[in-house]
Amino acid sequence: MASDSGNQGTLCTLEFAVQMTCQSCVDAVRKSLQGVAGVQDVEVHLEDQMVLVHTTLPSQEVQALLEGTGRQAVLKGMGSGQLQNLGAAVAILGGPGTVQGVVRFLQLTPERCLIEGTIDGLEPGLHGLHVHQYGDLTNNCNSCGNHFNPDGASHGGPQDSDRHRGDLGNVRADADGRAIFRMEDEQLKVWDVIGRSLIIDEGEDDLGRGGHPLSKITGNSGERLACGIIARSAGLFQNPKQICSCDGLTIWEERGRPIAGKGRKESAQPPAHL
């Protein structure tokens, strides 16, 4: 697996919809990514309001750079250098507490899967991240079953050959409680985890080396803080949607709103005084 973040790892392509209306918008977008470590190339298509970024950075970091120009940006798809789409998925994490996040999966090659995401509301430090057996949230995260482990192995670290297939190690939250990470895994496959769940834990995963009775079972990483079902998502150019057919919101109106529930219908801006 690669590092939590930075410019290491396999290059992938991020497809963003960006609000652009003129050539100065294009110039500002290009300038925002120019010379950034981990960004190899940028394609800006004004007519389609589309920006393609070839990068090794987490999508959240690229999106923040784009939105630093004062323009909204929405990630619409991810892809690898492969000619065919090998599969992509996403998990929206939530729970009874304040922890929430988005984690994406992209099958880079038949042997290598990219996992990247952003999780907020954590205590600073390391937190175990695991794929679990079931996509069942009827009892919050407690009904998701054990770590995904079709091989009957003991719990271990992501670089161990003998480990649960769902053992993704730890992600680190900063002083503000945010974890931004990008990692690659040679055991996990997108097609094996769709319909299962992803869980972020309260504490550090000891990677099976801690000597605690739970070390070889869960990594002794504590309570389950937040979870989400892993669902199939769009690869490159597979998401042409500009308006949601379910409620008529544009992709710009959706930005910053929940994907479901009462909060989705409430405007993020106060009504105009007419």
UniProtKB/Swiss-Prot annotation:
Give, from the UniProt record, the effect of changing residue 244 to S. Reduces copper binding by half. Negligible effect on zinc binding
| UniProt subcellular location | Cytoplasm
In this UniProt entry, which cysteines form S-S bonds?
A: 141-227
UniProt superkingdom: Eukaryota
The record's remark on the cofactor is: Binds 2 copper ions per subunit.
Region annotation (Superoxide dismutase-like) ranges: 88-234
Keywords for this protein: Chaperone, Copper, Cytoplasm, Disulfide bond, Isopeptide bond, Metal-binding, Phosphoprotein, Ubl conjugation, Zinc
Crosslinked positions (Glycyl lysine isopeptide (Lys-Gly) (interchain with G-Cter in ubiquitin)): 76, 189, 216, 241
GO molecular function annotations of the record: cadherin binding; copper ion binding; protein-disulfide reductase activity; superoxide dismutase copper chaperone activity
Q: Which Pfam families match?
A: HMA (PF00403), Sod_Cu (PF00080)
* Cofactor annotation: Cu(2+); Zn(2+)
* Residues the entry annotates as binding Cu cation 1: 22, 25
Q: Which SUPFAM superfamilies match?
A: Cu,Zn superoxide dismutase-like, HMA, heavy metal-associated domain
| The protein's assembly and partners | Homodimer, and heterodimer with SOD1. Interacts with COMMD1. Interacts with XIAP/BIRC4. Interacts with SLC31A1(via C-terminal domain); this interaction is Cu(1+)-mediated. The heterodimer CCS:SOD1 interacts with SLC31A1; this heterotrimer is Cu(1+)-mediated and its maintenance is regulated through SOD1 activation.
Give the family per the record.
In the C-terminal section; belongs to the Cu-Zn superoxide dismutase family.
Give the protein's biological function. Delivers copper to copper zinc superoxide dismutase (SOD1).
PANTHER family in the cross-refs: SUPEROXIDE DISMUTASE CU-ZN -RELATED
Could you identify this protein by its name?
A: Copper chaperone for superoxide dismutase
Organism of origin is Homo sapiens (Human)
Higher taxonomy? Eukaryota, Metazoa, Chordata, Craniata, Vertebrata
Q: Which gene encodes it?
A: CCS
